[in-house]
């Protein structure tokens, strides 16, 4: 995949039926809905889906979710330090070259190159903000959505009981 050099404008259509494409963790993971009843997918959700697809395609991704983490790094700082070239730049402290850090990060990680990234870690003097050419806006459903909640009921005994009353 080539280096992204220009701003890219595009639209996408996502077809979702009988699914929760972007649950809200602050609302019991119910679907995100506008006040008018339209479904909403946040820009963060869309970027996560793009990152996951790029990761599946073999691209180096900096912001990996815990459930799709392929390098076993438990934080962004650990991932930055694990990269030999970028980690070496971080360790230079106040002598770090921000331009060199920018070049390394954009070369190494497709999502940094695409969406940008802020590198500001506790204990590091290198603070780096990278702007990417791809910006993502929230998506909304074409029609209002109906939210139905289904409760699961148990119809069998999981253990034997000593006495049954019929």
Please report, for each region that a protein language model flagged, where it lies by residue.
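RNA-binding basic/glycine-rich loop and surface signature characteristic of RAMP-family CRISPR effectors
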Residues: 1-166
């Amino acid at each position: 995949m080539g280096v992204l050099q220009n701003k890219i404008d595009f639209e996408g259509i996502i077809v979702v039926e009988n699914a929760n494409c972007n649950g809200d963790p602050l609302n019991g993971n119910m679907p995100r809905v506008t006040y008018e009843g339209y479904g909403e997918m946040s820009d963060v959700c869309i970027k996560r889906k793009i990152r996951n697809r790029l990761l599946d395609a073999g691209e180096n991704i900096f912001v990996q979710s815990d459930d799709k983490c392929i390098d076993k790094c438990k934080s962004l700082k650990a991932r930055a330090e694990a990269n030999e070239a970028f980690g070496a730049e971080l360790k230079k402290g106040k002598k770090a070259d921000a331009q060199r850090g920018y070049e390394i990060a954009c070369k190494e990680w497709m999502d940094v190159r695409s969406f940008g990234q802020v590198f500001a870690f506790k204990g590091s003097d290198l603070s780096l903000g990278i702007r990417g050419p791809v910006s993502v806006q929230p998506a909304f459903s074409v029609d209002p959505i109906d939210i139905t909640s289904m409760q699961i009921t148990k119809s069998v005994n999981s253990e034997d009981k000593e006495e049954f009353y019929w």
